[in-house]
Amino acid sequence: ENMFRKFLLACMVMATFTMQIQAISINELNSSSQFKNVYQKSYPYEGGSIQNKLISYLNTYSVESLEYAAPHYKLKGTFYAVYETPRSASITEYELTATYDTNYSLGSLIQAMNLVKPSASMYAVIKAAQDKSGIQVELQEVKRYNVDGTEVISKVPLEHQLRPLDRGRFDEDLFAVADAMFAVAYQQHFDDIVVK
């Protein structure tokens, strides 16, 4: 019985020291090399000169490969979206699973257009890229925080999406995060890959 108690105590101590810190603050996001600012955008607040701001930070240590079967890849990672308005600021933690088809990277599309028609116009390449980005995402909101790192308890349901990414303005933040995950995993940007 005494040996069992010692075992339980040892397990509790191990669990305490191996648990990841769950809370995240704006200071951590800005100061730790583990978090990379991969997207930032300011836009006017209610038509005035005061700006709202969205900043996305990728936890570079969280990126893991789930599938590697070129030209198809699947990665999973965690990122934090910081929303700043004139009145408040908040942090939202997301888990992003991105499935990549490099047949649709800009490099591959340009290569394919040149094979079909040697002087492919950039318009045709851009049109093809807009029709299909080559990235499908599953986005799961995990937690919400105040900028000091305290968790926000809310009755608002956590967001969940499963959909293809658009290369346009609507998804430019998620595209930047998915591209940064690809660069962390493979040391190359998604659109630089050329499938021959």
PLM feature spans:
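Sec-dependent N-terminal signal peptides
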Residues: 6-19
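N-terminal secretory-pathway/extracellular module detecting exported/lumenal segments
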Residues: 23-196
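Short, Lys/Arg-enriched N-terminal segments with co-localized hydrophobic residues
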Residues: 1-3
